[in-house]
A protein has these predicted regions:
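Binding-site signature for planar aromatic cofactors or substrates
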Residues: 1-207
């Protein structure tokens, strides 16, 4: 990912927070079929390896897992909030007119060798952990035990798990850091006044 110095984010805990806060990640691999990409929920184990390890699963009918069996490098992308930045937000525009539209956003990219697994116990543990993560906070959280055991076994038999020990982690926080203080304040205030939740979140992050 292209990351100008002003927008680089390399604090591991900050990167991990964005990974864990992204409900749906993007898995990209390159193989005999060319580039393949899928949107899937991912689970981070932050203590496994220097940058953590990511876990997920794919349907057996999805050909991407076959490309991953050889240990091919995987790219996992975690997009954060984003916002269109209008030149009209910049006070400096009134002075010299030298302003164009841009975009503010957060993104994390994780790279590492993929490992595919079929073990039923390991798959069950992964699905349980993902379920507990996304059911947390509900009044009556769903658990694997809420469904018939044979049905869960059937569902587990239709998926393949994978792990990606992270070997490289990149983070980008593009929040108008390359502008002067009045322009930064103008963008922040302009986004805060928007009715779009993503705009408001970017404004909050700029404080």
């Amino acid at each position: 990912m292209y990351i100008p110095r002003a927008f680089n984010e390399d604090d591991l805990s900050t990167l991990h927070r964005q990974i864990e806060g992204t409900r749906l990640g993007i898995l990209v691999t390159q193989g005999a079929r060319g580039l393949l990409a899928n949107h899937i929920p991912l689970l981070l184990s932050p203590e496994q390896g220097p940058y953590g390890t990511l876990y997920g699963h794919l349907a057996k009918a999805n050909p991407q897992w076959q490309e991953m069996e050889s240990g091919t490098e995987a790219l996992l992308m975690f997009p954060g909030p984003d916002a269109y930045v209008s030149p009209s937000f910049y006070p400096s525009k009134a002075e010299h007119g030298q302003a164009v539209p841009t975009w503010n956003y957060l993104a994390v990219h994780a790279y590492g060798p993929a490992e595919v697994f079929h073990d039923a116990h390991r798959l069950r543990d992964l699905v349980r952990a993902l379920t507990e993560k996304h059911e947390a906070g509900r009044a009556t959280p769903w658990t694997l035990e809420d469904a018939p055991a044979d049905y869960i076994d059937k569902m587990l038999g239709a998926i393949v798990g994978f792990a990606v020990p992270i070997s490289r982690l990149e983070g980008k926080r593009k929040l108008t850091q390359n502008r002067n203080a009045p322009d930064i304040a103008g963008v922040r205030d302009g986004l805060a006044a928007s009715s779009a939740p993503n705009d408001n979140e970017i404004a909050r992050l700029m404080r």
